[in-house]
């Protein structure tokens, strides 16, 4: 499976190589990310609790434990108010002990991570409050988690492209000068994950993440 870091590098290179009409902005962020419960269904041959699992998983984000939660994006502003770009987020979900006991799993997590890669569109309102520029964005893309599943039926550990992903963002950027800025934002992702297991089974789950991000941006 191709490492998602190479995928985002190629996507960003293609973006920057395109003709620049106005402004290119590179942003990096980290923050606190959580995930609500989600239903997990599928098949897990050899699972000593249920080989056709169907349960609600309780997820933990653990944003500041290695590997930490982070993201970065490249945006091309084609006008003062409209832009588009590519974004990569390294989020994480860990199941709790109760969830693993209920489903018959020793390990059930997407922790390196549940990687979300999207193409986004943005709308901003420049200098709406002095040096503060509010913005909103949304995008479509793919989920590339590092699937870590272990039960009596076997072990799965590796990157997979598991399905579609959606992203919504709302935030504000404070301009330090014409080049550098800092920002804070709320970000939501939804990913539809169909994960293959090495024992021939499969698990499905729609996973939502909610995050409060802070970051720095460089424009040129």
Where are these regions (language model features)?
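Predominantly the C-terminal beta-signal and adjacent terminal strand-loop region
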Residues: 38-39, 46-53, 59, 176-220
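Bacterial N-terminal signal peptides that target proteins for export
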Residues: 1-8
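Residues that define the transmembrane beta-barrel architecture of outer-membrane proteins
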Residues: 66-70, 113-117, 132, 160-166, ...
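Gram-negative (and chloroplast) outer-membrane scaffold detector with strong preference
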Residues: 75-152, 210-220
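Extracellular loop and loop/strand-boundary signature of outer-membrane beta-barrel proteins
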Residues: 57-60, 102-110, 150-159, 198-204
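N-terminal signal peptide c-region/cleavage motif recognized by signal peptidases
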Residues: 17-19
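Short glycine/proline- and aromatic-enriched beta-strand/turn motifs that initiate or cap beta-hairpins
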Residues: 21-76, 213, 217-219
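Strand-connecting loop/turn motifs
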Residues: 21-25, 32, 79-81, 129-133, ...
């Amino acid at each position: 499976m191709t490492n998602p870091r190479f995928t985002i590098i190629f996507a960003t290179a293609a973006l920057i190589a395109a003709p620049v009409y106005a402004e290119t902005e590179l942003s990096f962020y980290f923050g606190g990310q959580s995930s609500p419960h989600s239903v997990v269904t599928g098949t897990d041959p050899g699972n000593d609790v249920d080989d056709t699992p169907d349960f609600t998983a309780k997820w933990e984000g653990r944003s500041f434990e290695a590997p930490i939660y982070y993201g970065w994006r490249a945006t091309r502003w084609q006008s003062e108010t409209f832009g588009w770009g590519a974004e990569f987020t390294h989020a994480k979900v860990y199941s709790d002990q109760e969830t693993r006991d209920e489903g018959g799993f020793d390990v059930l997590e997407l922790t390196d991570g549940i990687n979300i890669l999207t193409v986004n569109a943005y709308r901003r309102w420049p200098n709406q409050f002095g040096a503060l520029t509010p913005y909103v964005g949304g995008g479509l893309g793919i989920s590339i988690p590092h699937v870590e599943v272990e039960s009596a039926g076997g072990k799965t550990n590796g990157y997979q492209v598991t399905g579609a992903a959606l992203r919504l963002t709302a935030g504000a950027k404070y301009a330090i000068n014409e080049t550098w800025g800092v920002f804070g934002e709320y970000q939501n992702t939804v990913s539809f994950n169909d994960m293959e297991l090495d024992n021939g089974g499969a698990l499905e789950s729609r996973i939502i993440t909610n995050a409060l991000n802070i970051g720095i941006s460089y424009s040129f």
